[in-house]
């Protein structure tokens, strides 16, 4: 309490606190309105173009900031009462007192929080801290465009930072110069099935800063904030920072809190490539180690005051930890040198047989065939390809009426049929069997006849399902295969036109929706419906020969894709996670684990990967290609580079008290039909702590419907974007760089060597005229060339 009073007196004396209004803390750039109950009513940042008001929950259970304690899995919230001084409040729960002071700190709105254990024994909660009260509840269009999604929260040993972002790309950063144990979010409940067991919902009710948290925590987190001894107190200052552009995040936070930060534009590299990253700090010491703890030589060059460039060659496949020490502060990052794309696809194909593909109500449970057929197309291996084809045919026959060529079960789940269409096309391209393409074509006709509305939308009864596992993209994939046969067979020409027109109508409906999309399950600003809408519009744009139409669709796609940034890990300095999208309700269905947790990357992160790839081809903006390759590097790490085994997803949350089913359903085998989402609590379960880690697959032992094979979307995405494609870019400063290739040359002559044998397509994005040699062939390309120069990649 003495500390708080001295701090308050100092701030008043310095003129940082206004004396006029009891409920408003402000300076020239912002106003912070505090209610009589100690909660935030609103936080307004003033800008030249207008004001940005940060929404907070009002008169709800999620009002904040609110002190809370979780013990034995149950939350208790404290109620603030005035503490006798302006802008200060206090509360107590079971002998633990918390005091909060709202004030100006380094020109930013800030809270200083002190927690005191007045009890007679140590205080060791599950967690204790603040529910911030920022409105994160995205439940309806168009309201969700103004809500803040917790995009990045990062605990370091000595400090904390992160940011929330809206779909309109307004960014609110959080920063503390003090170590914070952990963070968490509260998710809504979804539905009971069966009673009394709950599945989790699709919305976020609260972002929590957990100042004290039980162990274990990830190694990067503080390891000494798991208790308060009797009589002990700890204090934290937490500031809110208005970030105008995300590129300015690290610089702005360093300026406010004087913490060292690592800024990485690229997180994924090939072995032997030189990695670069910027370090923001005063006198940083930088160390890079491999996963065995061996140091790798780093060179550090000063670029400007407080900015340094680090360079390091990553010698072999693996993960590399970068550590920056600046004074008494320490930050960490992870770089990845990824395995070859060929090895990645070959291991994914092996996983298709190890982790059973099963005939269920959900296409996710047989998604592995995508990886297997793509690998079989480029790297045929009869010893496994024949077994894969046999397994696919077995499941297809279980799930379909072979005579009428339609699904036997759950026909309204049209994503099952569109996924099967895509797999049949890939199987046809791998094996050349016309019967597979014919099945795909007939299934597309059935889907269109039964589930396409007059306005073009593909639907499940009354809900638009076009962007539930990209139904239109699967039909366009079929169209492209049919078009190759159309010149010799009018039947295929007719089918290609029919299917293209259908998919185009569905995508046009998405464009006209202007972001008012629908999806499966509970409505929210949902990662998949946004990225799948963007990717399908982008794919259609690439198929347009008319430049006006191409631009029309490209502009629509880019608007949607930019809104998706708030759901994507675009700034996290971690190559395992970069480019992953923030899904959080899949664990209960995929690996039978509760409660919700952020899975990133998850299989559905691949949907954004297609979209950024298409965005690059449409615009030539290297930023989209960087995002694509960073994501592909993260995706490839779902295959453990040490042993080739497949993992399901990476969990981002630092600390989740989880429960997971640990026994198979003895009534079924992997060859049985099984329908619906099994409730994990109906089986033997095991309690476990999950935090910043990969989670294993379960389909090798779980016999009923489990959807962990959706991870294979990542390898399908790799197969369509980077497996066979290289890219050369001339940057504005004249530097020529390659992705998936090495570029050499002199003057206006370039020689390009692919990183892998199967890379046979080269896209060039050049400002000046060049003569380019690739794969033993040469071409002269004119000024401003931005297109495929050798080969022609699909979409």
Predicted regions mapped to residue ranges:
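Glycan-recognition and catalytic cores of secretory/periplasmic carbohydrate-active enzymes
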Residues: 304-315, 319-321, 329-769, 775-779, ...
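Beta-strand-rich recognition/accessory modules
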Residues: 24-27, 130-133, 137, 163, ...
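Beta-strand-rich interaction surfaces with strong enrichment in secreted/lumenal proteins
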Residues: 100-102, 223-227, 298-300, 310-311, ...
